[in-house]
Amino acid sequence: MQACMVPGLALCLLLGSLTEAKPLQEYDPYAEPPAMPYWPFSTSDFWNYIQYLQTQGAYPQVEDLARTFFAHFPLGSTLGFHVPYQED
């Protein structure tokens, strides 16, 4: 019985280190949400940057740029940013 447990335990430890599994973080009520990025340009600037980056094939940069731009709209909370309440 112990002969099976020792290799089984070693296998579990090996597989755990290979998968780089991390424990789930518990909810921390005092953790600050990430700061909302700053976008000082106009909407047309945004689309010009998107078109330029697409011609260059820089799709990771397009995603970062879109995340920064759209964080300023009410859907920013779905991107992981805290968006303050805005009156219409």
Curated annotation (Swiss-Prot):
Signal peptide: 1-21
Entry similarity comment: Belongs to the otospiralin family.
GO BP term, example: sensory perception of sound
Compartment(s): Secreted
PANTHER family named in the record: OTOSPIRALIN
UniProt GO cellular component terms: extracellular region
Chain's gene name: OTOS
Alphabetized InterPro entries for the sequence: Otospiralin
The name this protein goes by in its record: Otospiralin
Pfam family, one: OTOS
Tissue specificity as recorded in UniProt: Ear specific.
Role of this protein: May be essential for the survival of the neurosensory epithelium of the inner ear.
Alphabetical UniProt keywords: Secreted, Signal
